[in-house]
Amino acid sequence: MPTINVNKVDLERLSNISLSDKIIEDRFPMMGVEVEEIFEEVDKNGKKQKMVQFSINPDRPDYLSVEGLARGFRGFMGITTGIQEFEVLNSDIKVIVEENETRPYVAFALVKNVLMDEFVLESMINLQEKLHWAIGRDRKKLAIGIHDFDKVKAPFTYKEIKGDEIKFVPLGYEDEKMTPREIIEKHEKGIKYAHLIQNDKFPIIVDANGEVLSMPPIINGTLTKVTPTSKNLLIDITGTEKEAVEETLNIIVCALAERRGTIVSVDVNGKKYPDLSLKSRMISVESINKKLGLELNPGEMIQAVKKSGMDALYEDGNLIVKIPAYRNDILHNVDLKEEIAINYGYEKFEGKLPSVATTGSKDPVEKKCNAMSDLMIGLGFYEVMNLTLSNQDTLFEKMNLKVEEKDYIEVLKPASIEHRVLRTSILPLLLETLYINKHHSLPQKIFEIGDCVVIDENDTETDTKCKNIKKIAGAITHPLTNFNEIKSSTEALLREFFEDFEFENYEHPAFIPGRCAKIIKDGKEVGFFGEIHPEVILNFELEHPIVGFEITIE
C-alpha cells in the first residue's frame, strides 16, 4: 500500500483538533488508515518536526494528501460532518485542444490564493507523485502538471508536435533549452518515461505567447515552476482514460481548496472543468442492517453517512446518498455499507458465539466438482482452466449463436477486446483451447469446471441482477471421434453424479443436426452434448472432427 509522511503540526492545523500520539494510533486505524510510525526528523532550518507515516488503501486516493486525510478525520471525529461543498467560480480562461492521438483526454483547473508554504508545497508534490502511481499507473494512464499561473498567459493550447519543433527549458535544467527529442535522450525523467511517447509525436502545452508549460507525461517547463511564494496554481491532467483524468483533477483541486484556495473553472474545448457536481445512490435501509448485522434506524445511518463526508435523506425505506466528486471509491452500494460501518464504529460491533458448535468442511458443491474432476481424469481427459472473461466473437459468433446484448454481461471498461464479456458458456473456450494446442498430437480430450455468469432479473439478493452458475464442459478431437464417444463419456459422468436423467433430440446451431441431444433432469434442461458443426470447427480454425458436452452443476 502507498505510504505518506505527514507533519503532525500541519495535520492538527487542518483537522482543527489537538492530536496526541495515542489519538493518532487509536483513531486513524478505525477509519481504515494504518499508522506505520510516529517519528521525528530535522527540517531544512535544523528544527525537529514530529512526523506520522500512514499507509493508505489504494481505494482512497483522496487520502494521499494531508489535506484529504484531515478532511476525512474531521468527519470521522464528528468535528465537521456532511458534504463539504467547494464553490467553482467561472472564468474566461480557455484551453484549445488540437487532435492528440497519444493522450487524447485533458482537463484543466485554476486554484487561486492558495496559502502556500513549505508544508503545502511538499504535500502538493507528494500528492502529485502518489496519484501518478495510484491512478496514473506510473504516468501511463494519466500525468499531472501543476504550474505557477502568474508566469503564463491564457489561452493555452494542447497539441502534438514533432521532436525538433520547439525548444524549452525543462525542470532540472535551469538554463539549457532542449527539444522534446533531446529531453527523452538526455533528461533523467525523459529517459525514464520515453516509452510513453509514440510515433515521434510529443504532447505539449503552450500559452498564448508560445511558452511551454509542460510536455506531458514527461516533464514540466522551468518557466512555471511552483515555489513557496506561488499562490495561483494551474493544474493540467492529460491521459488515456477520460474518467480517471477528471476524477484526479477533482481530488487535487479539493485538496488545494483545503488550503483556502479558490477554485476557478477552465474552458477546455467548450467543456468547463472541474466538474464538482454531486453523485447520487439509493440504498435500502433493510439491506444495510442485513449486511452489517445491526438494527440501526435511518437517523443513525444518516449520521454515519454524514461523518463519512457525504449527505443522505430517508425516503420510502431507502437512503438517498449524495456523494462528493472527490470520492471516486464509491462504486457500489456495498461501499456505502462499509462507510456506514466505519463511521458507526467498528469497536461497537459485538462478537456473538454461534448457538451450535460446528467444524469446518468443504463446500458440498466444491466436493462434487473435485469428484467430477477425478472422474474426468479417469476417463482420459486433461483439465484446463480458462478465464471467466471472454468476448462476443468466441462465445457467440463462432458458435453460430444469435444473441442480444441483454443476454450477457459486458465489462464497462475492458482491458482488451479479447476480455470484454463474462462467459455464459464454457464449451466455446474449450474450442479456443484446442485451437491454441492444434500443433500437438491427437487425440486431445480436455474438460473444464468453472463459473459462468448469467443475468437474473428475479434476483433480489444483489444489485447486479446476475448470478454465477457452476458448469462442466468437455471436448474431444481426433479424426475418428463421433457422437457415440461423447455420449459414452457424458453418460459415465451423469450416472455417477446425476439421478433420473434422460436424453432428447436437440437442435443447436453449434452442432450437426440430428447429432445433438439435450439432457433433461426433473423436467428441466441441464445440459447438451453432440458433434460440433463443421462450420463451427472452421470458425475456430480447427481441422478435425470435434465432439463436446456441457452440463450445469449448480
From Swiss-Prot:
Cellular component terms, GO, for this chain's entry?
Answer: phenylalanine-tRNA ligase complex
Asked if the keyword Cytoplasm belongs to this entry, the reply reads yes
Specify which residues bind Mg(2+) according to the UniProt entry for this protein: D329, D335, E338, E339
Q: Where are the transmembrane segments?
A: none
Q: Name the chemical reaction catalysed here.
A: tRNA(Phe) + L-phenylalanine + ATP = L-phenylalanyl-tRNA(Phe) + AMP + diphosphate + H(+)
Q: What EC number(s) has UniProt assigned to this enzyme?
A: 6.1.1.20
Among Gene3D superfamilies, the record links this protein to: 3.30.56.10, Bira Bifunctional Protein, Domain 2 (3.30.930.10), Phenylalanyl-trna Synthetase, Chain B, domain 3 (3.50.40.10)
Record-annotated B5 domain positions: 276-351
**Alphabetized GO MF terms:** ATP binding; magnesium ion binding; phenylalanine-tRNA ligase activity; RNA binding
List the subcellular locations.
Cytoplasm
Spell out the PROSITE patterns in the cross-references.
Answer: B5
Binding partners and assembly:
Tetramer of two alpha and two beta subunits.
- What name has this protein been given in UniProt? Phenylalanine--tRNA ligase beta subunit
| Chain's gene name | pheT
